[in-house]
Amino acid sequence: MGDRMLPAALRLAGGRAPILVPVPLTRARLRERGFNQADLLARALSRRTGWPTDCLLRRERGGPALARLGRRERARVAERAYSVNPDLPRALALHPEVLIVDDVVTTGATGVACAEALGTAGVECLGIVSFARTNPLAEPS
């Protein structure tokens, strides 16, 4: 799986060695599923690149699952769904840039929200890399 994301990750990194930051799940969702698919993808990509992976973001509990929402609602909910992990300064000592890793990009709201949360903490986000991208149906009017 890391092979599929490798070209985009290398292009976005531009010769740097960023921290791979998986999009987090809520604790409830992680317990239900038993794994975080974005974390598995980040680890696979890390094995191919040698870049570190670290869970620098937290998904705040509450709110609906983004996968079930339309474009506008996704953006509204995602805007306040992510926060920075308190371990952030220590993790960034050697690798000041990050790449966000997600399984699927639908509207881009999750990636933007994660990048904004990291940006407010002074982290340079080089981009988001995902395993797949969907082509969402138009929202009903």
Which residues make up each language-model segment?
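Conserved PRPP/pyrophosphate-binding segment of the phosphoribosyltransferase/PRPP-pathway fold
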Residues: 1-100, 107-141
